[in-house]
């Protein structure tokens, strides 16, 4: 399975158009948050993604809420918003958790505490692909990642952790044991599963 994954487009329609083009050769597409910029421009930014013919999995970032993302994609046939939920595609589980984890200093930000995230991550299936807007603590995070994401990925032997949020770490990779951790960025990353 060929997965195209990205994060943090922040209303960049040129990046979105490039991702739609790249998606023509993908079996599944995953966007792990921050489609909007401080809750503005969400609908215009995600609208082009409706043209993608493969299944599309979207996770909210800290710049949009899960409810806003669900509303913006309501009625789309191939799009699933994941926030504390799992989608199975061709025998592979994908679990999504969005928002800033731990909480950020910005009053506009969609965030989760470490405890809220840990409670949500209890549902992470064994060996799933973990789509988390926030990176795991100590991995592609500049020291700002989530302990809950780290523990869940390690304990459930995640197949991969695909994240974003920390822009200075885009395209960087790390490992939690055998688990690939990749901070994606807006250019698109292809992973064979």
Set out the residue ranges of the language-model regions.
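Short glycine-/acidic-enriched loop or helix-start segments at secondary-structure transitions
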Residues: 15-16, 40-42, 68-70, 105-106, ...
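Conserved catalytic scaffold of divalent metal-dependent phosphoesterases
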Residues: 11, 64-152
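Histidine-centered divalent metal-coordination motifs
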Residues: 10, 62-63, 133, 160-167
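Structural motif
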Residues: 3-5, 29-32, 96, 129-133, ...
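Residue-level detector of structured alpha->beta connecting loops
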Residues: 27, 53, 125-126, 157
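Beta-strand-turn-beta hairpins that frame and shape the catalytic cleft
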Residues: 1-4, 87-96, 129, 174-181, ...
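Core catalytic region of metal-dependent phosphoesterases/phosphodiesterases
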Residues: 6-89, 184-187
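Conserved beta-sheet core of the metallophosphoesterase superfamily
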Residues: 50, 55-57, 74, 138-193
């Amino acid at each position: 399975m060929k997965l195209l994954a990205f994060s943090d487009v922040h209303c960049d329609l040129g990046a979105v158009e490039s991702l739609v083009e790249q998606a023509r050769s993908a079996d599944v597409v995953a966007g792990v948050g921050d489609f909007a910029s401080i809750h503005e421009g969400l609908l215009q930014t995600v609208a082009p993604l409706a043209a993608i013919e493969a299944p599309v999995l979207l996770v909210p970032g800290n710049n949009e809420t899960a409810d806003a993302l669900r509303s913006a994609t309501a009625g789309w046939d191939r799009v699933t918003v994941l926030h504390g939920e799992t989608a199975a595609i061709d025998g592979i589980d994908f679990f999504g958790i969005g928002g800033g984890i731990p909480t950020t200093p910005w009053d506009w930000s969609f965030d989760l505490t470490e405890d809220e995230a840990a409670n949500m991550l209890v549902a992470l299936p064994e060996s799933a692909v973990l789509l988390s807007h926030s990176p795991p603590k100590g991995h592609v995070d500049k020291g700002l990642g989530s302990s809950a994401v780290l523990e869940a990925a390690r304990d459930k032997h995640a197949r991969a952790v695909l994240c974003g949020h920390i822009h200075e770490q885009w395209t960087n990779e790390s490992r939690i044991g055998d688990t690939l951790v990749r901070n994606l960025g807006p250019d698109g990353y292809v992973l064979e599963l």
